[in-house]
A protein has these predicted regions:
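A short, conserved alpha-helix within the catalytic core of class I
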Residues: 105-121
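A conserved beta-strand element that flanks and buttresses the S-adenosyl-L-methionine
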Residues: 97-98
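Conserved beta-strand/loop positions that form the S-adenosyl-L-methionine
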Residues: 35
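Conserved alpha-helix/loop element of class I SAM-dependent methyltransferases that forms part
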Residues: 10-29
């Protein structure tokens, strides 16, 4: 996946930061692993709340990891481009965070990469797996109306549409 504007993408992802961190008070982990950490904003937030926890970020984008490295300066965070390296750490009490990555895998990956993603997720190393709940409202019981979609396409910021596919 190529992101045209990292700043716009990361700014939009940060808007839901508190939702993504909601689970923190419900798990007792020594380590938090953000799979698809982007610019590291969630890891930075966790570090501010729990400075003694071990934090690990993973992203397949070298550009994102460079931004995360700058954003996380002074935080005790390890960043990885290859998730197999994270798995090899053999962490006993770790929470794997999947806050904004599942839709990316399905949107941009093929069947093989989707299967590989789930193989990595369900590795025995993780005590908890935190998935941000993005269930639709109960009132949604139909396909999107083409007029609604057209209205969104007409009124939306073109940069946002480029970053978040309709």
């Amino acid at each position: 996946m190529e992101i045209a504007n990292l700043k716009v993408y990361n700014d939009n992802m940060r808007k839901s930061l508190l939702d993504k961190a909601y689970f923190l008070s419900f798990v007792d982990s020594d380590t938090f692993i953000d799979f698809g950490c982007a610019d590291g904003s969630l890891l930075k937030h966790i570090h501010e709340m729990f400075p003694d926890k071990k934090l690990i970020g993973h992203d397949i984008s070298p550009e994102m990891l460079q931004v995360a490295e700058k954003n996380l300066e002074g935080c005790n965070v390890s960043l990885y481009n290859n998730f197999e390296n994270v798995i090899s750490l053999k962490l006993d009490n770790a929470t794997l965070i999947l806050s904004s990555v599942i839709h990316e895998v399905y949107s941009y990956g093929d069947n093989q990469s989707v299967n590989e993603f789930w193989r990595q997720v369900f590795n025995e190393n993780f005590r908890y797996i935190a998935i941000r709940d993005l269930t639709p409202r109960k009132s949604i019981d139909r396909m999107s109306d083409i007029n609604d979609v057209s209205r969104v396409l007409h009124n939306a910021n073109p940069t946002h549409l480029a970053e978040f596919e309709a």
